[in-house]
UniProtKB/Swiss-Prot annotation:
GO terms for cellular component: cytoplasm. This is Gamma-glutamyl phosphate reductase. It comes from Bacteroides fragilis (strain ATCC 25285 / DSM 2151 / CCUG 4856 / JCM 11019 / LMG 10263 / NCTC 9343 / Onslow / VPI 2553 / EN-2). Catalyzes the NADPH-dependent reduction of L-glutamate 5-phosphate into L-glutamate 5-semialdehyde and phosphate. The product spontaneously undergoes cyclization to form 1-pyrroline-5-carboxylate. It comes from the Bacteria. InterPro entries: Ald_DH/histidinol_DH, Ald_DH_C, Ald_DH_N, G-glutamylP_reductase_CS, Glu-5-SA_DH, GPR_dom.
């Protein structure tokens, strides 16, 4: 397989995007949103073909599944992107040097962005809308689990692009096989940035094999620390929401850390989890506090593997600590640097937590479920970065632009 011709076509299409006015881009985005709704039956029928090949018990199943409601949400997100100001051509810095040169630093597209993702067909729409709005061409490399869905979505997008006389190569879907992934990771000279979205195994593979820049959107091993000064009602609501709102996403709660002085509150903190049949892997102290108060079939002794696991399922761990410092230590050891939360009524404790915890998103008395581009007012997200360069946290339009310097003068030469 040689995809260089495909990569070159995407690159060429990307150069023309820079010439599209923002109002034209917004028209295209709104048309794609409308097409997604008009072709709901087609998209869902193709999605069902993917679902039929996967067990409903697979943690990826919920991510893979599209519904009419989810497609309405996707269309709404695309329309929201259209309402956002263009991230391009913004003056980031300007100055006049002593010799009269005028320097202007302006935002520009990356060029071509490659996205490697697994069983999440909604990503195809998200990536397209953000890349179009930011003037980037995009190469989609979806997993085989979602191949029917991704092909249907890209076909819907291409239909709209053709209506607007836009080169359809601006969004290209690669074959769903590993050889295509390897070629994409080595597309030096064609692709400017790779963003992997998926399991830690996928992200590690991309990091270890790519010869072009990568922004990691790491696994979400998320903790909520119920502090000795925590409010029980708030804690119960936050834990339930963070764990059960949607278990298959990266901002879902994986481990509750509880101060030993509040072990007697554990039954109340976990009460709402019973209805969702959440399996709890509890350390000895937490197990003893929950025994007789939580269904025996759902309460398991924790093992070393219980901590540091992204469950993506109706499962979570509980760790007991005897100090705030030990809570920080546990997070430091097991966190994926995605989203961490504290439940406390002590302002000093909250401030110290936000300063000391090294994560992209740090919450005080808030569910980690809010780590999301739309919730942050970004319209949508191309991923949630857990690294510190070039972006961190939910990545919206600004995070998928770069910049260049424009230098204007009147014949200046350097001595």
């Amino acid at each position: 397989m040689n995809l260089n011709d495909t990569f070159a076509a995407v690159q060429a299409a990307g150069r023309h995007l820079a010439l599209l006015p923002d109002d034209r881009i917004n028209q295209i985005l709104n048309a794609v949103a409308e097409a997604a709704l008009e072709q709901t039956s087609y998209i869902l029928s193709e999605n069902r073909k993917d679902l039929e090949r996967m067990s409903p018990d697979n943690p990826k199943y919920d991510r893979l599944r599209l519904t009419e409601e989810r497609l309405r949400g996707i269309a709404s997100d695309i329309r929201n992107v259209a309402t956002l100001p263009s991230p391009l051509g913004r003056i980031l810095k300007e100055s006049i040097r002593p010799n009269g040169m005028r320097l202007t630093k302006i935002s520009v597209p990356f060029g071509v962005i490659g996205i490697i993702y697994e069983a999440r067909p909604n990503v195809s729409f998200d990536v397209f809308s953000l890349c179009l709005k930011s003037g980037n061409a995009c190469i989609l490399k979806g997993g085989s689990d979602a191949d029917y869905s991704n092909r249907a979505i890209v076909e819907v997008i291409h239909q709209v692009l053709r209506q607007f006389n836009i080169d359809t190569h601006m969004v290209e879907l690669l074959p769903a096989d590993r050889e295509a992934t390897r070629e994409l990771l080595h597309a030096t000279g064609y692709v400017d940035l790779i963003i992997p979205r998926g399991s830690s195994a996928l992200i590690n593979f991309v990091r270890q094999n790519a010869t072009i820049p990568v922004i990691e959107t790491g696994a979400g091993i998320c903790h909520t620390y119920f502090d000795e000064y925590g409010d029980t009602a708030k804690g119960a609501a936050i834990i339930h929401n963070a764990k059960t709102r949607r278990v298959s996403v990266c901002n879902a709660l994986d481990c509750v850390i509880v101060h030993e002085s509040r072990l007697s509150d554990l039954p109340l903190l976990c009460e709402k989890l019973k209805a969702d049949k959440v399996i709890i892997y509890a350390d000895p102290s937490a197990y003893q506090a929950l025994e007789g108060h939580y269904p025996a079939g759902l309460l398991k002794p924790a093992t070393p593997e219980s901590f540091g696991t992204e469950f993506l399922d109706y499962k979570m761990a509980i760790k007991t600590v005897n100090s705030f410092e030990n809570a920080l230590g546990h997070i430091q050891e097991y966190s994926s640097r995605h989203s961490e939360s504290i439940v406390t009524e002590n302002p000093e404790r909250a401030a110290l937590f936000t300063r000391m915890v090294d994560a992209a998103c740090v919450y005080t008395n808030v569910s980690t479920a809010f780590t999301d581009g739309a919730q942050f007012g970004l319209g949508a997200e191309i991923g949630i970065s857990t690294q510190k360069l070039h972006a961190r946290g939910p990545m919206g339009l600004e995070e998928i632009t770069s910049y260049k310097w424009i230098i204007e003068g009147d014949g200046q030469t350097r001595q």
